């Protein structure tokens, strides 16, 4: 009886959040493709070089730019929040690959969750802090 060796592909995952956005990121050894919600990353992020640079930043710091494919399930928020959530998810996935990556990513600030979220509107005000115009008389 012959035994077959089944080759498994390693999949590393990480979750990132920013504002109202949540990105579930999976890194698969590959050629550096970015796929977001089944759409190529360039078209999903509207060919914006800034959003693409932010999404690839953790891989670029470690010099692993064309070694992993990034598959993302992103929901909520806008493109800026989703791009930053992808960056955090990629950084966390890279830490699960090799714990030695943590110090380089931490020094760049890629492992820090940005705590800023939209402040709620208060009653009696027009927005969160904007008050109606004051009239002395």
Swiss-Prot record:
Family that this chain belongs to: Belongs to the universal ribosomal protein uS9 family.
GO molecular function: RNA binding; structural constituent of ribosome
Chain segments carrying region Disordered: 116-137
Keywords in alphabetical order: Chloroplast, Plastid, Ribonucleoprotein, Ribosomal protein
Name by which UniProt lists this protein: Small ribosomal subunit protein uS9c
PROSITE patterns, A to Z: RIBOSOMAL_S9 (PS00360)
Subcellular location: Plastid, Chloroplast
A single GO BP: translation
The organism's place on the tree of life at top rank: Eukaryota
InterPro entries to which the protein is assigned, alphabetical: Ribosomal_Su5_D2-typ_SF, Ribosomal_uS9, Ribosomal_uS9_bac/plastid, Ribosomal_uS9_CS, Ribsml_uS5_D2-typ_fold_subgr
Ranges annotated as biased composition (Basic residues): 118-137
Coiled coil: none
GO cellular component: chloroplast; cytosolic small ribosomal subunit
């Amino acid at each position: 009886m012959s035994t077959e060796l089944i080759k498994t592909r390693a999949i590393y995952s990480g979750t990132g959040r920013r504002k109202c956005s949540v990105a579930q990121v999976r890194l698969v050894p590959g050629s550096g493709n970015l796929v977001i919600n089944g759409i190529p990353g360039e078209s999903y992020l509207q060919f914006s070089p800034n959003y693409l640079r932010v999404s690839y930043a953790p891989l670029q710091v470690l010099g692993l730019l064309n070694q992993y494919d990034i598959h993302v399930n992103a929901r909520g928020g806008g493109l800026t929040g989703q791009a930053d959530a992808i960056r955090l998810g990629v950084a966390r996935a890279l830490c699960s690959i090799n714990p030695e990556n943590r110090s380089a990513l931490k020094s760049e600030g890629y492992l820090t969750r940005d705590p800023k979220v939209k402040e709620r509107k208060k009653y009696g005000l027009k927005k969160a802090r904007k008050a109606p115009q004051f009239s002395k008389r």
